[in-house]
């Protein structure tokens, strides 16, 4: 009997401190991240960046348990989605830069008589640096494996109602309806170099559209904040990136009570557990914030599971 498979794709994160170097090496060798045409030059750049950042990155991961939480959360999500769709559909996941890699997921499917593989990158908004990179990685390796299943892909899902309900649920976990009007809400998105957007990447537009959808949904749910903002985090290097930065936005806001939701991430990782929870909490404290609260990502929430069921159904 022919079967179908759902493969969830994400960037990954170190499963231990030794894998930090693997993570950085693979990420900065990605042609969608370092976009120079010469693979030799890209390798040189990747080596230099990895050498300069490994020790500092290991210190960061050491502060959040010695590893990224992304694989653990994803395993729970896969288990719940598998239970939801039933045993006739195989649900698995693969990471772009750390184990489990795409090659491992393909190997597990090799003797399962798969007719169609549904690829769902866990990035709500499309970007060449994330969605395109993950899809290309799977496509290239699957064709090298001589697989003959049909690959079906989705590019983004920020409009999905159940996914957005998962976001509202996470926000309501951190602040009650009664006290929302005392808080500013910041949707913090992972930043990108401005030149990526200028080349036609739709990420910034998708983030803006996503926030507009969420604002309409919050209004219907009676979720009223003092103000709602967009800011960008995680800038590295000297190039100009999307603005405003999260630090600048925190400095600009007059109200000293703030809720942060990481709008670009579906699964908690170092950018949420360290950068938002620890690093920017210290920044906010130094700025005199009375309240600084960070929402969890959807992770394995029931609404997110239902969103993935929706997405799969619409892809069929």
UniProtKB/Swiss-Prot annotation:
GO-annotated molecular function: ferrochelatase activity; metal ion binding
SUPFAM superfamilies referenced in this protein's UniProt entry, alphabetically: Chelatase (SSF53800)
Keywords (A to Z) from UniProt: Cytoplasm, Heme biosynthesis, Iron, Lyase, Metal-binding, Porphyrin biosynthesis
Similarity comment: Belongs to the ferrochelatase family.
Gene that this sequence comes from: hemH
Keyword field contains Metal-binding: yes
Pathway(s) served: Porphyrin-containing compound metabolism; protoheme biosynthesis; protoheme from protoporphyrin-IX: step 1/1
InterPro entries recorded: Ferrochelatase (IPR001015), Ferrochelatase_AS (IPR019772), Ferrochelatase_C (IPR033644), Ferrochelatase_N (IPR033659)
Task performed by this protein: Catalyzes the ferrous insertion into protoporphyrin IX.
Species per Swiss-Prot/TrEMBL record: Sulfurimonas denitrificans (strain ATCC 33889 / DSM 1251) (Thiomicrospira denitrificans (strain ATCC 33889 / DSM 1251))
Catalytic reaction equation(s): heme b + 2 H(+) = protoporphyrin IX + Fe(2+)
GO cellular component: cytoplasm
Cellular localisation: Cytoplasm
Residues noted as binding Fe cation in the record, renumbered to the chain: 190, 271
Pfam families assigned: Ferrochelatase
Name of the protein in question: Ferrochelatase
EC number: 4.98.1.1
HAMAP family from the UniProt entry: Ferrochelatase
Main location: cytoplasm
Entries under PROSITE patterns matching the protein: FERROCHELATASE (PS00534)
Keyword Metal-binding carried by entry: yes
Signal peptide: none
GO biological processes: heme biosynthetic process
């Amino acid at each position: 009997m022919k079967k179908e498979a759902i493969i969830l794709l994400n960037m990954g994160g170190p499963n231990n401190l030794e894998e930090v170097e693997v993570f950085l090496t693979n990420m900065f060798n990605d042609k969608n991240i370092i976009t120079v045409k010469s693979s030799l030059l890209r390798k040189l750049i990747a080596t230099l960046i990895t050498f300069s950042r490994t020790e500092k990155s290991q210190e960061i991961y050491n502060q959040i348990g010695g590893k990224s939480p992304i694989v653990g959360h994803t395993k729970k999500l896969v288990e719940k989605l598998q239970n939801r769709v039933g045993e006739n559909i195989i649900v698995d996941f693969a990471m772009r830069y750390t184990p489990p890699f795409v090659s491992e997921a393909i190997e597990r499917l090799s003797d399962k008589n798969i007719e169609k593989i549904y690829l769902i990158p866990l990035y709500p908004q499309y970007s060449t640096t994330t969605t395109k990179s993950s899809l290309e990685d799977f496509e290239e390796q699957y064709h090298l494996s001589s697989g003959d299943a049909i690959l079906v892909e989705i590019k983004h899902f920020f409009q999905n109602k159940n996914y957005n309900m998962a976001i509202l649920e996470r926000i309501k976990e951190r602040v009650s309806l009664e006290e929302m009007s005392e808080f500013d809400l910041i949707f913090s998105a992972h930043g990108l170099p401005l030149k990526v957007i200028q080349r036609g990447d739709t990420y910034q537009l998708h983030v803006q559209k996503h926030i507009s959808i969420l604002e309409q949904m919050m209004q219907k749910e009676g979720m009223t904040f003092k103000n709602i903002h967009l800011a960008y985090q995680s800038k590295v290097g000297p190039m100009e990136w999307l603005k405003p930065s999260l630090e600048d936005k925190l400095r600009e806001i007059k109200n000293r009570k703030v809720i942060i939701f990481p709008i670009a991430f579906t699964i908690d990782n170092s950018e949420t557990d360290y950068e938002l929870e620890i690093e920017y909490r210290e920044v906010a404290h130094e700025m005199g914030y009375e309240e600084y609260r960070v929402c969890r990502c959807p992770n394995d929430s029931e609404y997110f599971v239902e969103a993935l069921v929706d997405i799969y159904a619409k892809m069929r």
